[in-house]
Amino acid sequence: RWGPKEIQQLEKDLEGEIDLLWLTGELRLERPSLEAEIEWGLQFYKTSIIEALPRVFESYDDAVKSVFGNQDIDHFDLRFHSWIGGDRDGNPNVTSEKTLFALEAAKEMVRSIYSGSLTEIASQLSISNKIMPLSESNFVTLNEIIRLRSGDPESLIRRNPNETFRQALTAMNQCLDDGRYKYVNDFIVDLKTIEAGLHSIGAVNISEK
């Protein structure tokens, strides 16, 4: 929690932002294109919505556990929708091509967010097999990710020897960047495999970050 001085500084910063908004002129002097509107709408996901999701899920988990006890629970589903680029019945400028652009832009946004997260996690997850050996089954499943998802698994293994988790995450990122994940569920299964591997060595707190 923030102390009194931190709260005071945050309030001061917020007041400064409000003052700046009041003193700022019109950002657009002409009507934006539909493509610009689509990109602008997606910025809300990048800058706030996606970042807030883990806290939403954590609050949900805590609430369920407080009622039903400490048991495995499935997350509730959140599905995002946007009318920008898809309001085919109300905007004559929205053509099939514009809707396709909106879909591709959203797809690329999600891919870039996950790719950035995988890069960050892989840079930090320096667990060594020499210090904490994996069970045979977890070692096999993680290496299956490396073999299937990486374009060059041998060089990946040489670059990060004895760091199976980092290798697997990097392989997943390569697959994501290359567009080789055919189905969302394949990506989810790989993430759950990483999570199961971390749980198997007692690194539950690390898996929850």
Residue spans for each PLM region:
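Secondary-structure capping and boundary motifs in well-ordered enzyme cores
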Residues: 10, 72-80, 106, 208-209
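Conserved phosphate/anionic-ligand binding catalytic regions in large, soluble enzymes, centered on
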Residues: 78-98, 209
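Extended active-site and interfacial segments that coordinate phosphate-rich ligands
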Residues: 96-120
